[in-house]
Amino acid sequence: MKEFRSFLSPQIHSFIRYRQASQRWNDSSYEENLMLFDHYCHANDPCATALTQEMVDGWCRQRRTETNNSCRSRIYVVDSFVRFLNMRGLSNVQPPQIPRKERRRYLPHAFTEEELIRFFHECDSIPVINSRKETIIRKMSVPVFFRLLYSSGIRTKEARLLLRENVDLRRGVLDIQYSKGHDQHYIVLHDSMLEIMRRYDAAINGIVPEREYFFPSIRNSHFNRGWVTKNFNLLWRKANTSHATAYEFRHHYAVTNLNQWTGYGFEFHDKLVYLSKSMGHTTLESTKYYYSIVPGLSEIIKEQTENSSEWMIPEVPLDEETY
């Protein structure tokens, strides 16, 4: 854990332990934003011994360069921290005013076969530098990690936090414990992906024995969100000129399956339920979102299933966590 500087340090550590215990903590974003707030308090009043309204309001005020959503992301953990203190009688400061959430129309990148071929070629071409252990792990892990995203629709966070004990390499089933909303679900691997995972497991075990996570870092922990973003961006930009993100493999997986099912009529519903469960959606509404990003698909489904499709087609796409 990184160093907190202000008088709030003991209370921040208590807050983090509390959130981790309740599985409501995100190392990559919450800790960073909480640390920035801590450093802000220390820089502006290094002799302070109590949290003040001015500290909270000064840090949480929306900046001219921020959208409502980016401001919400930055101050959310501070709002939660203030409420944590208030509930325990450690502060009487009012939580910050959080801007209204803006609904965004998001159109994910549509991967082409050529783009994917070039990208995975770059993944497979990662060099080992001076036999350094860190570069060996990267060369072994990156191609498998991104192929898992591509072939299963798993969330990037789910893949990062995937425990080795929750990967059944005999049956080819992933037990997803850490997910959006903390709902456990299962993913069945394609045979080709299962074989890749088996080879990776045997190889990486020789580098990081007795590892806890299926994709281990050099410190035998899990990779953070920045690792995913950095590696994807670096390799994607080497291979392609278009903009894309690692999370869009999940969209690609859903859309590819939906496109393959347009001729199945009423069987489509059964397949949709299976897809929804395997992607970890708590309701079919979340899966229906993908209709809106498949050109013409909703009209095709209406033609095939007539009035029975009314419950399938969403009017407004739902937000999906992107990490």
Task: Explain the meaning of each model-derived region.
Residues 1-323:
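Conserved catalytic core of the tyrosine transesterase superfamily
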